């Protein structure tokens, strides 16, 4: 049986989750990352995607996050999300609105670096929309 560790998912609006879990899969910028108890200390950035949380009872909860940071310690993990909602509460119109707003910002962008970041963000949001619509 896997050991439990404390996981907290925090957005600027509220604390979405704080409980003992067996594993958390996070959409790290460098790729999906599974965090379990006794994980090596790590800090990583988070891209838009799905955070999957598995409790000790085996219950799985999914959340949509729109970027942020994860602070991982052997005793726990805190994910500070720019924005996050339980996947069942995701308003798909809001996701489409975010994509359209990013496209508009891309049209007005002047600097190459800003354009590149926006293009990547749009790609991530579009992929996320496809993943969420499949579920």
Swiss-Prot record:
Record's subunit section: F-type ATPases have 2 components, CF(1) - the catalytic core - and CF(0) - the membrane proton channel. CF(1) has five subunits: alpha(3), beta(3), gamma(1), delta(1), epsilon(1). CF(0) has three main subunits: a, b and c.
Pfam families named in the record: ATP-synt_DE_N (PF02823)
Role noted for this protein: Produces ATP from ADP in the presence of a proton gradient across the membrane.
Matching CDD domains: F1-ATPase_delta
Superkingdom of origin: Bacteria
Protein name: ATP synthase epsilon chain
Organism: Rhizobium etli (strain CIAT 652)
Alphabetical list of PANTHER family matching this protein: ATP SYNTHASE DELTA/EPSILON CHAIN, ATP SYNTHASE EPSILON CHAIN, CHLOROPLASTIC
GO molecular function: ATP binding; proton-transporting ATP synthase activity, rotational mechanism
Alphabetized UniProt keyword annotations: ATP synthesis, Cell inner membrane, Cell membrane, CF(1), Hydrogen ion transport, Ion transport, Membrane, Transport
Subcellular location: Cell inner membrane
Family in the record: Belongs to the ATPase epsilon chain family.
Record InterPro entries: ATP_synth_F1_dsu/esu, ATP_synth_F1_dsu/esu_N, ATPsynth_dsu/esu_N
């Amino acid at each position: 049986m896997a050991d439990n560790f404390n996981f907290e998912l925090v957005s600027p609006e509220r604390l979405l989750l704080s409980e003992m879990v067996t594993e958390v899969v996070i959409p790290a910028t460098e790729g999906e990352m599974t965090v379990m108890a006794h994980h090596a200390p790590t800090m990583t950035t988070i891209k838009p995607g799905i955070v999957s949380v598995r409790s000790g009872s085996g219950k799985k909860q999914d959340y949509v996050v729109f970027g942020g940071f994860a602070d991982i310690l052997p005793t726990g993990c805190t994910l500070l999300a720019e924005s996050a909602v339980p996947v069942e509460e995701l308003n798909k119109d809001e996701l489409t609105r975010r994509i359209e707003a990013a496209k508009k910002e891309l049209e007005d962008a002047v600097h190459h670096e800003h354009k590149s970041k926006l293009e990547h963000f749009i790609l991530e949001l579009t992929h996320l929309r496809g993943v969420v619509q499949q579920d």
